[in-house]
Amino acid sequence: VGVALTRIPQRPTDAAPPSPAPETSYIAAGSLTGRTILVDPGHGGYDGGARCRDSGVWEKEVNLAVALAVEKSLTRRGATVLMTRRTDTDLCDDTTRPANVTKKRQDMQCRVDMAVQGQADMVLSIHMNEYRVRSESGPQVFYRAGSGAGRLLAGTMQEALITALSPQKERAAMPGDYFI
């Protein structure tokens, strides 16, 4: 399981700035009222992602199922949840894609655009990675490098995943700079 957390810093210039909140507000056990979270089930449509060698299930299918469950959980806690997809589709539009832009690049840019346009406070990009050696597999949460709030939330999520899944390999939350 891979989850990338990104705090979206851009807001339209005509929007009022959000009220300041302590970094721990994202991980408080209480309400998420007033927070907008974009949930991105990775891959979709033409892009299946990794495929399980044992079952033949595509990553895009598992990502979507997990994302829909995450949406329900976040909504129950009061968050406004935006979804990049709810079905097996990608975000490409071949009729408007410039010739020098790959389908994958347009799909990823559309995901970023949805977060910015939706004024998301956070992005959860959900992936199920494949490891050739089973003992290396396990959940891992990534956050934007330099984000204190992201680091705190990612650490909390990483601990919860380890507790819930009891993986052979206990990974740590890691910083990164990802283009979803």
Which sequence ranges carry the predicted segments?
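Catalytic-site microenvironment of enzymes
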Residues: V1-I180
